């Protein structure tokens, strides 16, 4: 893609605009302006690499063994590893994009327990080693689109969620899948202090319809760039649903429960008119306070190289997933 050297001011400052708008939601939850501005040092750290300056590499995780199936490889330009692991939303560790990388080292990911329960014939529990050894791992290069209208392309490593669910044998009553993040206030400052964590109700919870969870694209993710996930990216295991906005990609999962009824989800509870259950990437359905028609791709350049590009329906995965929503009004079911 040819670089646009004549960026509009809105292209360069869009992140501050979107962050201020997200702050409006958090303010409605009772979070003060002072708290929302902390910590200021994170801004300087973040801007250092947006200006093209060198940053220390993300903490190295354990190297993983994985295959690279041709079906999941492509020629999309990758977002550099330091940006994938240095520009994150993980409010359990703070509101600024650099806070997770700065603060998530406190999260203990081994030992770890992931329980699969609910409407299943065979409930099961996985430990830390099971997450990387029980299923063949594969690298998948996926687009990632945040609801804040920025995007990345990331080489995730993991296994299809449907393989895990198949072991548990969902019953005929199972219609939805509910996910839950670890609740560990002593390790996650945002869970301990509502000002640091944006006033959200914790633990963070998410959900999918069962057919969405069983789709081949839906990935239980344990690594990135060839190594185990760093804590700020959701170690030791997170969800990636590439046709949905990033907040559906729940991190540091400890519970998967199959249910009869649609489960609650964190951002929908916080602002139901702004964050729907489905959260499918859709350039034709705007957020109430900003457009979703375009996005800023975070690539290898500095802030002056940031590109605005059209957002693709279902984030470019329409051919694979559009049939899941046949007959569903995507404006009503956003």
From Swiss-Prot:
Disruption phenotype: Cells lacking the msrPQ genes display no visible growth defect. It comes from the Bacteria. Keywords: Metal-binding, Molybdenum, Oxidoreductase, Periplasm, Signal. Residues 1-44 form the signal peptide. Mo-molybdopterin binds at residues 88, 91-92, 146, 181, 233, 238, 249-251. GO terms for cellular component: outer membrane-bounded periplasmic space. Induction: Is induced at protein level by hypochlorous acid (HOCl), a powerful antimicrobial released by neutrophils, but not by H(2)O(2). Induction by HOCl is dependent on the presence of a functional YedV/YedW two-component system. It is found in: Periplasm. Belongs to the MsrP family. Heterodimer of a catalytic subunit (MsrP) and a heme-binding subunit (MsrQ). This is Protein-methionine-sulfoxide reductase catalytic subunit MsrP. The gene is msrP.
């Amino acid at each position: 893609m040819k670089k646009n050297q004549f960026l509009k001011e809105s292209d360069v400052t869009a992140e501050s605009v979107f962050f201020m708008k997200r702050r409006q939601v958090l303010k409605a939850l009772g979070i003060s302006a002072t708290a929302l501005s902390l910590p200021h040092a994170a801004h300087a750290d973040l801007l250092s690499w947006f200006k093209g300056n060198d940053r220390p590499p993300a903490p190295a995780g354990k190297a993983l063994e994985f295959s690279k199936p041709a079906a999941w490889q492509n020629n999309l330009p990758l977002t550099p590893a330091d940006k994938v692991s240095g520009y994150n939303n993980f409010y359990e560790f703070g509101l600024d994009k650099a806070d997770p990388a700065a603060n998530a080292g406190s999260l203990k990911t081994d030992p770890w327990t992931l329980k699969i329960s609910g409407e299943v014939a065979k409930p099961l529990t996985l430990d830390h080693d099971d997450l990387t050894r029980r299923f063949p791992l594969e690298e998948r290069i996926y687009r990632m689109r945040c609801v804040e209208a920025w995007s990345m392309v990331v080489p995730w490593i993991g296994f299809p969620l449907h393989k895990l669910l198949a072991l548990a044998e969902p019953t005929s009553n199972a219609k939805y899948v509910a996910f839950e993040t670890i609740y560990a206030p002593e390790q996650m400052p945002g869970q301990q202090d509502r000002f640091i964590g944006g006033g959200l109700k914790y633990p963070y919870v998410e959900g999918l319809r069962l057919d969405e969870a069983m789709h081949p694209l839906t990935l239980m993710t344990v690594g990135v760039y060839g190594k185990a996930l760093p804590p700020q990216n959701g170690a030791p295991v997170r969800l990636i649903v590439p046709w949905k906005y990033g907040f559906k990609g729940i991190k540091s999962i400890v519970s998967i429960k199959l249910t009869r009824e649609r489960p609650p989800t964190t951002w929908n509870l916080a602002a139901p008119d702004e964050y729907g259950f489905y959260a499918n990437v859709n350039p034709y359905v705007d957020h109430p306070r900003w457009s979703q028609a375009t996005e800023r791709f975070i690539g290898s350049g500095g802030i002056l190289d940031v590109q605005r590009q059209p957002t693709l329906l279902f984030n470019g995965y329409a051919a694979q997933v559009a049939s899941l929503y046949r007959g569903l009004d995507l404006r009503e079911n956003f």
